[in-house]
Swiss-Prot record:
Nucleic acid-binding protein that promotes Pol IV-dependent small interfering RNA (siRNA) accumulation, DNA methylation and transcriptional silencing. May possess both RNA-directed DNA methylation (RdDM)-dependent and -independent roles in transcriptional silencing. Acts as a pre-mRNA splicing factor that associates with several typical components of the splicing machinery as well as with Pol II. The lineage of its organism: Eukaryota, Viridiplantae, Streptophyta, Embryophyta, Tracheophyta. This is Zinc finger protein ZOP1. It comes from Arabidopsis thaliana (Mouse-ear cress). Residues 201-233 have a biased composition (Basic and acidic residues). Residues 42-71 form a coiled coil.
């Protein structure tokens, strides 16, 4: 039988970072030693410092988050207040009535009940009875005065025919006819119209013709004669029997 010698392993100390003999006596002596106790105290001190630094960092981050949330809340509330002010400035006036309507053509709000116009940019009011832009108190005072005099605030549209008296429908049968009947009739003109036109042409004075116009008229007349001479044999072609 063959016997083998096996060496005894050592023990590693995590605090001192050294190897010691792996037996109870060596381990006890090492644990009771001054160096080991100092290393253990240092390790515990480092652990406490790291824990305190971690707690401090957590508290710092928590405080920073609270500041960010508070700043975001203030900014949000400020934005809401600004939006409400803008909506109030650009919206209809808050006078307890809901009769205001936005006129897209002019960009002003109009109240059909009292006839006032409101400009949301400046906050002024306009009325036909006043004739210029005024504040809210002056506008409603004018409306109250106008309502007391029983004068309509909204002007009635004036007809295009002017301010003359209205003409009623004439009695009897209504016959519609054109103002110029000759122009509406289609067809050949009458002999009377032809005679009048011919008389007008005869009464007109002859215009002076230049030499160039005379040459052009002469050339056109010669061309017309040539065309007539060329087409004379063809006249009556379709009247010949086959």
């Amino acid at each position: 039988m063959t016997e083998y010698w096996v060496s005894q392993g050592n023990k590693w100390c995590e605090f001192c970072k050294i190897w010691i003999q792996n037996n109870p006596t060596s381990i006890r002596n090492h644990d009771l030693g001054k160096r080991h106790r100092e290393c253990v105290d240092k390790k515990l001190t480092d652990m406490r410092e790291r824990s305190a630094a971690k707690d401090k960092e957590l508290k710092k981050n928590e405080k920073l988050l609270q500041q960010i949330e508070a700043k975001a809340t203030r900014s949000y509330q400020k934005d809401i207040a600004t939006a409400q002010q803008v909506a109030k400035a650009n919206g209809a006036p808050e006078d307890g009535t809901s009769d205001w309507m936005l006129d897209s053509a002019s960009g002003y709000y109009y109240n059909q009940t009292n006839g006032l116009h409101y400009d949301s940019q400046s906050g002024f009011y306009y009325s036909d009875s006043i004739g210029h832009w005024v504040t809210q108190d002056e506008a409603y005072a004018a409306v109250k005065t106008s309502s007391g005099t029983k004068v309509p605030l909204v002007k009635k549209p004036v007809s295009s025919s002017g301010a003359g008296p209205s003409v009623g429908k004439p009695p009897g049968r209504l016959v519609t006819a054109s103002l110029n009947p000759k122009r509406a009739v289609k067809g050949a003109a009458s002999s009377v119209d032809l005679g009048n036109n011919k008389r007008k042409r005869q009464d007109e004075k002859p215009k002076k013709v230049s030499a160039e116009e005379k040459a052009a008229l002469k050339a056109r007349e010669a061309a017309r004669k040539r065309v007539e001479d060329r087409e004379k044999p063809l006249l009556g072609l379709y009247n010949r029997p086959f």
